[in-house]
């Protein structure tokens, strides 16, 4: 199948069939990542590893920071040497190996299992993450009106995987009674479930890629490809010209937005550490519900709240910006609203923490509130980031400043680990 045939091999909704194949692969990869993420900080403070919450938070922050850094190298290697599709295969294999290594703590030293497993996941994510989204982009011509809708469908896969993972991996892996010896060592089943999810996605990808993708993403980008690419030609021409005062002002604006985004992501990533600890230690996990009666929750289940809110609210926010038309808030306004809404969320959980100090475990509503407002803040700020870069960055430095935007997540996660540890 030629590249052109791939782009025109569509469903009744007009989107390329290859999009839905990639949707499934991404869904299982995110199931793999978010299933592990829901358990990681709790696993590190368990009797298996025995870290303090401070140490656990620092390691978690470093891990999630590096997850955002390695895709820069992975994308470069795929473009120049390996090819995007081979990189996806390598990344999926490494991430699955990482999950099963995490689950091997009874066979090898638990600290060694933890360090090796996380390292494999970090490297695997670097090969996988940038290349699958790039292939989605290659399913469309640059000005194809289906492109935005296609990416919306693709990113829905992220949230579907992220929603189900905490329930399945948490149910299998998080002990209900840590004092029970058999229960205390069931973490491995959660990590094995996450790794199995990645293997399912990998098998689906290997079986389906030739049928749906043709030659798209199969080979590295050659010098001739770059010479024939109109965008690369435009960058080459722009590179010969010095930056104007207006471009320097836009660069300063980018760094200003990145600075504030660092703090947003630092608090947003408390979900995996301090909010996870709050769920485990300060939240009533056996509430009595009307009609249903008493239910038993696990701390890891709350990691599913953000993705379900994203699924519910993302279409509403998209319609809101569209409906506002020319009154659509500016980029600084959206950043401001994002930080403000996040602040409301953490004010709510602070009230919950005060009630816990006074009366013991509190209602889960306080955690749900912080996730609700943080999700609304995320929808104001996070999608605007790359869009802001493409609007403001000089053409010849476009790739560089896309990388600069990713550093907001990198430094934000480092700061998140430090905040949670203190």
Predicted regions and their residues:
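Short amphipathic helix-loop junctions that connect adjacent transmembrane helices
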Residues: 38-57, 271-299
């Amino acid at each position: 199948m030629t590249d052109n045939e791939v782009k025109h091999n569509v469903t009744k909704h007009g989107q390329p069939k290859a999009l839905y194949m990639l949707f499934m692969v991404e869904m299982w990869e995110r199931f793999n990542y978010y299933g592990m993420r829901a358990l990681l900080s709790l696993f590190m403070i368990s009797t298996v590893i025995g870290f303090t919450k401070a140490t656990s938070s620092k390691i978690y922050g470093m891990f999630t920071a590096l997850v955002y850094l390695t895709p820069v190298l992975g994308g470069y290697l795929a473009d120049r040497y390996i090819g995007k599709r081979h990189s996806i295969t390598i990344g999926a294999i490494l991430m699955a190996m990482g999950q099963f290594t995490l689950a091997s703590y009874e066979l090898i030293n638990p600290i060694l299992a933890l360090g090796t497993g996380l390292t494999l996941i970090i490297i695997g994510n670097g090969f996988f993450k940038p290349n699958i989204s790039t292939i989605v982009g290659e399913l469309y011509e640059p000005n194809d009106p289906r492109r935005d809708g296609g990416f919306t469908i693709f990113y829905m896969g992220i949230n579907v995987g992220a929603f189900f993972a905490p329930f399945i991996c948490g149910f299998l892996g998080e002990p209900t009674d840590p004092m029970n010896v058999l229960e205390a060592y069931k973490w491995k089943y959660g990590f094995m479930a996450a790794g199995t999810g990645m293997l399912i996605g990998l098998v689906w990808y290997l079986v389906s890629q030739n049928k749906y993708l043709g030659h798209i993403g199969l080979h590295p980008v050659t010098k001739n490809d770059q010479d024939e690419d109109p965008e690369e030609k435009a960058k080459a021409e722009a590179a010969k010209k010095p930056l104007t005062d207006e471009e320097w002002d836009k660069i300063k604006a980018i760094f200003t937005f990145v600075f504030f985004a660092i703090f947003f992501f630092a608090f947003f990533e408390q979900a995996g550490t301090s909010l996870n600890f709050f769920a485990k230690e300060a939240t009533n996990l056996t509430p009595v519900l009307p009609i249903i009666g008493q239910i038993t929750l696990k701390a890891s289940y709350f990691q599913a709240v953000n993705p379900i809110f994203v699924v519910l609210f993302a279409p509403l926010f998209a319609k809101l910006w569209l409906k506002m038309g020319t009154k659509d808030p500016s980029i600084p306004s959206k950043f401001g609203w994002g930080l403000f809404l996040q602040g409301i969320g953490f004010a709510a959980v602070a009230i919950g923490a005060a009630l816990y100090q006074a009366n013991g475990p509190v209602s889960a509503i306080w955690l749900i509130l912080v996730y609700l407002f943080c999700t609304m803040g995320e929808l104001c700020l996070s999608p605007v980031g790359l869009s802001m870069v493409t609007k403001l960055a000089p053409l010849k430095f476009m790739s560089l400043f896309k990388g600069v935007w990713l550093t907001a997540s990198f430094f934000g996660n480092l700061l998140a680990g430090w905040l949670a540890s203190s």
